Structures are given as structure tokens and as C-alpha cells.
Amino acid sequence: MGIDQRPLAIAVMGPTASGKTATAIALARQLDGEIVSVDSALVYRHLDIGSAKPDAAERAQAPHHLLDLRDPWQTYSAAEFAADASRVVVDIVARGKMPILAGGTGLYFRALLQGLSPMPEADPAMRAALAAEAAERGWAALHAELAQIDPAAATRIHATDPQRIQRALEVYRLTGTPITEWQRRPGVAPLPVRTLKLILAPHDRAVLHQRIEARFDAMLAQGFLDEVRALRAMPEMAAVEAPLDLPAVRAVGYRQAWEYLDGEGDAARFRDKAIFATRQLAKRQLTWLRGELDARWFDPHIDQERLAGAVSTFVAR
């Protein structure tokens, strides 16, 4: 077998609040790299505090790409991400730099590194119909429906993951073909790079939960609710008939803040709901990450030396 001549890239993956941003910046500084965000919330302008978007000081330490691409009333698909990220990575490599892919959106990573199956575009009317059904019957009932038409998808998609349940049923109702079958079809080619996948996750789940809670409290102190109030006050957002159906507003934390500002519950309940939703997101992310069999796992707080060794070995090949 010949030597693999593909350019190198490093993927910094992990659940929310696991320290990906700090690690990505450190690697970019060490390896003369540039960071490519792989996060579906960070593509939206005005979603800064609640998305833990790198701030000006962090961006000054290393170039960042694919932040602030869309307004929050717009949409951005995995296919658009794969095309944009591919162009950015090719440009970074052409300039002799190291691409550092950093984020926690599994669909974006799969689209970029494994290729993307052809798939029908999102249909706002169908999504609204499914959301109305869910409001009446509950997402568990729609998950049971998915299990009847696409058992493989229902096994992969947790009953508490409404966004993916909605997408799977949307694809089936639009085309009559299960999403699992669509995913088997050849589509967009994967990015031609050799990638070291680093997964950051505390060994103790309780530590991650503590980090999630502390980070959310810090976001509140930084003015997260004022950020959401400003979003709601934008004329373009006010004109949206069902803002809770927008991908930007469905982002964890933002949905709970939006509902709270709509008058649902008190401040303590809002905080509890947002922290719970973030923990559920982390759980789903860890489930996806366990399927990344070619990745290496590190606790960012105690495995720094081992992580540095893995990176050194990879770039020296």
C-alpha cells in the first residue's frame, strides 16, 4: 500500500461544554492552523452568548471560519455547510496551513468527512404540519410512527430528539422513501483529507453536567436573556409566523428562553429547562461520538500530555 498523500486535518469533537474551543485555539496556535467551525448554531448572526460563540479575544488568537453566515430567520442546510466547509478547507491547505475542524454537530461532521447523501430540501409547510401533529399527539407518538416506516432510523434517533424525528418523517412524507434508504445513496463526495479525530469528554459524566450548569449561569450573567429579547425585537423575526420552528430558535437554550419570554413559567423553571435540554443535547452528542470508531478519546482536564502526543505523532507521519 502506498503512502497516503492526502493533506492533514484535525477534528476537535465532543459534547457541548467539553472545552473544544480552547483546545482548537491551542492547536491552531501550535500548528499554524485555522479553525473551521462545525456547529449548527454558530452559523447564525446575533446568536452569540447562548451559543458560546468564540468572542473577539478568542478569534484574535487564531483565524475562525464559518461563523455568522446567516441571519436567525434564515436556514442553513448540512449540504450548504459541506460545500462551504470544503471550499474553506481547500483554501487553508493551499496556503500551507492546518485545518482544525471544531464543533459538536454530528451531521455537519458526517457531511464533510463521509460525504452527504442526496436528500430533498426542507419543506416549511411539511415541517409546520409535523410540528402541529407533535403538539397534539406528542413527539413520542411520531417516533413510534417512524419506527413503523423506518425501524433503522427509529433505532438511531432517540425519542427525545424532535428535530431529527421531524426530518426523518418529512423526508418520508415528501418522497415515500425512508430516510435510511436516502442515506445509502451516493451523493456529495467526502473531503479528501486525512483526519485525526480527537473527542474531548470528561471521564466522569457528573463533571460535564457541572460544566454545563456553570456555563449556563455564566451566560445568564453575561446577558443571555437580553440577547434573546433583542432577537425577538428584530422586525424580520417579528414577521415570522412560527419563530419556534426556525433552526436558530430551536438551538438549545434559545428555545427555552423564547418560551420563557412568551410567559411560560418563572425564571427558575426556565433555568432548569435550559440546563436539562443542554444535558440531553450532550447525551445525544455522546451517543453519536461513540459511533466514531476511528476517533481517540481524551479528558481535556487530565489527558493533555496524551493528547499532545497523539497530535505530534499524526503530524510527523
Curated annotation (Swiss-Prot):
Q: Hey, which family's this protein in?
A: Belongs to the IPP transferase family.
Oligomeric state and partners? Monomer.
What is a single Pfam family found in this protein's UniProt entry? Answer: IPPT
Question: What residues bind substrate, as annotated?
Answer: 16-21
Domain of life (superkingdom): Bacteria
Query: What are its E.C. numbers?
Result: 2.5.1.75
Which cofactors, if any, are listed as required?
Answer: Mg(2+)
Q: Which UniProt keywords apply?
A: ATP-binding, Magnesium, Nucleotide-binding, Transferase, tRNA processing
Q: What is this protein called?
A: tRNA dimethylallyltransferase
Q: Which NCBIfam families match?
A: miaA
The site annotation (Interaction with substrate tRNA) covers 105, 127
Region Interaction with substrate tRNA: start-end pairs? 39-42, 163-167
Q: Does the keyword Phosphoprotein apply?
A: no
SUPFAM superfamilies under this entry? P-loop containing nucleoside triphosphate hydrolases (SSF52540)
Q: Which reaction does it catalyse?
A: adenosine(37) in tRNA + dimethylallyl diphosphate = N(6)-dimethylallyladenosine(37) in tRNA + diphosphate
> Which range is the signal sequence, renumbered to this chain?
none
The record's GO molecular-function terms, alphabetically, read: ATP binding; tRNA dimethylallyltransferase activity
Query: What is the role of this chain?
Result: Catalyzes the transfer of a dimethylallyl group onto the adenine at position 37 in tRNAs that read codons beginning with uridine, leading to the formation of N6-(dimethylallyl)adenosine (i(6)A).
UniProt keyword annotation of Nucleotide-binding present: yes
Q: Which residues are involved in binding ATP?
A: 14-21
The alphabetized list of GO BP terms reads:
tRNA modification
